[in-house]
Amino acid sequence: MAVGGASNHRIGLYDRIMIKDNHRELAGLGGTGGILRSVERARKMYPGLEVEVEIDSLAELPEALESKAEYILLDNMSTADMAEAVRMTNHRAKLEASGNMTLARIPEVAATGVDYISSGALTHSVKSADISMDIIQPGK
């Protein structure tokens, strides 16, 4: 990634709490108020760690902002919805665009003003280089 000019804003599961929609559902925190309650619970359990919360619609954004999560992951949103999320957020949280993120789509999404773009295509759709090695013994 770094060789290609990309950088990571997360290194592992230890450096930030990531609350996905399925986590909320499994914890019984789905539905209205679930984002607020899940962020509150995470902060009590792991004080000092930043929190990222996933949303999949603009309707969830006000609650995510109210939770004061440092990062909000915009999952599988249209480019227009991402641009609206940037406007609504107004720098109150960092926004990460994710889901259905092809390499061709990245410039369009970057133009929305999101802070981060994650793309699984960098790992699951990479084209490997055709590299070979010949071993030559000295003196032959």
Outline where the language-model segments fall:
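Acidic/glycine-rich phosphate/pyrophosphate-binding loops and surrounding catalytic core
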Residues: 1-56, 60-67, 71, 83-88, ...
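Active-site loop ensemble at the mouth of alpha/beta enzyme cores that anchors a bound cofactor
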Residues: 132-140
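Short secondary-structure boundary segments
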Residues: 76, 99, 120-121
